[in-house]
Amino acid sequence: MTYDYHQYQRNNPNYYTAPISWIKETIDFYVDESDESAKNIKNKILIGIPFHGYSFQKSSSSPSGVVTASQFSQILSGIENNEFDYFSYEEEGEYIIDTGNNVINYPMKEFIEKRLEISKELNIGGIGIWDVGNGKESLIEPF
């Protein structure tokens, strides 16, 4: 499965859940297209799609917690009240929110759509959804 990516560099932290480039690199690592047996391997690979986000402490090298849909709704209220800095990272399909001490990411509908496209493009075994009960209903729309 290809999710739960986190790469921390002191001067260049990365707070994304599962960058598209990393998903492709991971699949390419395991699949050698010149090898006939690669077809059998591709059928076993799933792109993991998390229906949750993460909170990262800015001073830490790992996530400090999972963000569920109900928690994200509270965070959205903070954005509406101008309590937090927010932007959406369209290329990856993620919301990124800076709360001061933490950075929070959460998937957008586009996050799901992009990973479904990659699954078809790379002709792999399919997808695996993680945490269905914690996601926002809009995340199911692409299916």
Residue ranges and their predicted role:
Residues M1-L76:
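Substrate-binding surface in catalytic domains of secreted glycosidases
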Residues Y3, N102, W130:
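Flexible, active-site-adjacent loop/turn segments at secondary-structure boundaries
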Residues Q7-Q9, M108-E110, K136:
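Solvent-exposed, flexible loop/coil residues
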Residues P19-Y30, M108-R115, L139:
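Stable alpha-helical elements in mature extracytoplasmic
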Residues A38-I41, I97-D98, K120-L122:
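Extracellular/periplasmic catalytic domains that process cell-envelope and extracellular macromolecules
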Residues L46-E117:
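Glycan-binding loop/region signatures in secreted carbohydrate-active enzymes
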Residues F111-F143:
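Acidic/aromatic/glycine-rich contiguous surface patches that form carbohydrate-binding/processing clefts
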